[in-house]
Amino acid sequence: MARNILQMALPMTVAQLINILYNIVDRMYLGRLPGHLSLTGLGLCLPIISILMGFANLCGMGGAPLCSIHRGKGENEEAERILGNSFTLLLLFGGGLTVFCLAFRRPILYLFGASDLTFPYANDYLTIYLLGTLFVMIGLGMNPFNNAQGFSRMGMMTVALGAAVNIVLDPIFIFALDMGVRGAALATVLAQGCSALWVLKFLTGRRALLRLRWNTLRLQAARVRRILALGTSGFVMSMTNSLVQVLCNASLQHYGGDLYVGVMTVINSIREVVSMPVQGITNGCQPVLGYNYGAGEYERVRRGIRFTTVLTVGYSVAAWALVMAVPELLIRIFNDEPELIAAGIPAFRLYFAAFFCMSFQFIGQSVFVGLGRSRSAVFFSLLRKAFIVAPLTLLLPGLGMGVDGVFAAEPVSNVLGGLACLLTMYVTVYRRLGR
């Protein structure tokens, strides 16, 4: 069981690493421009990007586990229909979101914490990025179906192709062509287009076990409900992440100004990198757990949960120790402005104080999603972000903590939300499977 999980998790972890580089390489390059306004402007776009990714996860992470479960039962025709319906949903969401966000981008950006200084940078980036929304939907939303069929290396290549294109084009567009944030956005859109074409080529080709076919694209209400119900967990997590980013940026803008919005952009970038292996391992276990659960191999599911828990927690503790030891070194990867570093180091240590507890949330969530328990997955997605982090982000700064209150909300939520999710999974899933 451990070998099966690692066979899925290692390529997915590499894919997650590449995907993180894909997402943060813009920030690394823009951080090298004079000042911090370009980096801050990009940071203001991140909540909107999280929303777009949330809709992609709604379809991809909702449909892919269902495909694994039906494959385990030998029901490949139904698995293909889920694949086709998920693709149609991605197209519909992508088109609607593009029109809406382009029409209302100015009020949205100011609502999300933009100032008159940072709005031009955020607007330039977002306008171009939104033109590639369909590419984001297809590349991110359809790639989990590669993993659901056991082609985790192909899933890794989808991400690797986009990342390579982005890394190569970024310095050309940003510096050589002097396009600044517009160049970063254009490079990202072209990279996402390459990823989308790659994943479509595979899923319509002969190698795929489950193919994307014309006769599976017509939406069927019951099937759509199942996809959306299971995908709601990933969707809610992305939405609540976006909500927290908005509240953080707005609070930091109020209590600390543009500088602290830039600090949070750097912190979020580092968090994405260090949490990447946790996401790779827990995402990698989902198709294995789902397949064995569908086949009735409950003891193998229990062994998979044990292995995933030990591996994930072990990594998280080691990563936490490293992060707390060298904050300045990590911050300088993105920006070396003395003012930002001076403000960033104490904020960094406060934000990451209980980082290792975040792995508990990922473990519980992955088990719930992998076994098709959508209600539990949705509840714990909401609990940590919407019911703990968001209120604390508003409450603590007003109690005299200022910007420190914004950063302190994260470790509190990691402990409370993470433990609640892990313990509930143990009682309601792990123990019951052993009976």
Model-derived features with residue positions:
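N-terminal transmembrane alpha-helices
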Residues: 1-28, 32-33, 47-62, 66, ...
